[in-house]
């Protein structure tokens, strides 16, 4: 399984959530609404989730092993850094996405 596209939508509001991401796998399957969060130990990703009637959050889609989670997180955070730097240098403030 290869990550074939990462699309970053930066969040301009102040807060811990920095971006919302869509990731495409093998040009065939996409997962939307992955969040880039600023935590105490740096950036990390949160998979898309929904709130249950009991108030608990359950992932809608998620990797089933650590290796895959790390692969997805690295691809997202690497692309986030590129987009963050490009946006800083973009005078028009346009949204920037990247396709691999």
From Swiss-Prot:
Q: Which Pfam families match?
A: SpoVG (PF04026)
Recite the UniProt keywords alphabetically: Cell cycle, Cell division, Septation
Question: Which branch of life, at top level?
Answer: Bacteria
Keyword Cell cycle belongs to the record: yes
Which GO terms are recorded in the biological process aspect for this UniProt protein?
Answer: division septum assembly; sporulation resulting in formation of a cellular spore
Instruction: Give the protein's function.
Output: Could be involved in septation.
Q: Which family does it belong to?
A: Belongs to the SpoVG family.
* Protein name, per record: Putative septation protein SpoVG
């Amino acid at each position: 399984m290869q990550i074939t596209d990462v699309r970053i939508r930066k969040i301009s509001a102040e807060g811990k959530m920095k971006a919302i991401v869509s990731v495409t796998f093998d040009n065939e399957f996409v997962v939307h609404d992955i969040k880039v969060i600023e935590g105490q130990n740096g950036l990390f990703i949160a998979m898309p989730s929904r709130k249950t009637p009991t108030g608990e959050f359950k992932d809608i889609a998620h990797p089933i092993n650590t290796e895959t989670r790390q692969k997805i997180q690295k691809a997202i955070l690497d692309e986030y850094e590129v987009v963050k730097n490009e946006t800083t240098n973009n005078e028009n403030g346009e949204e920037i996405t990247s396709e691999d």
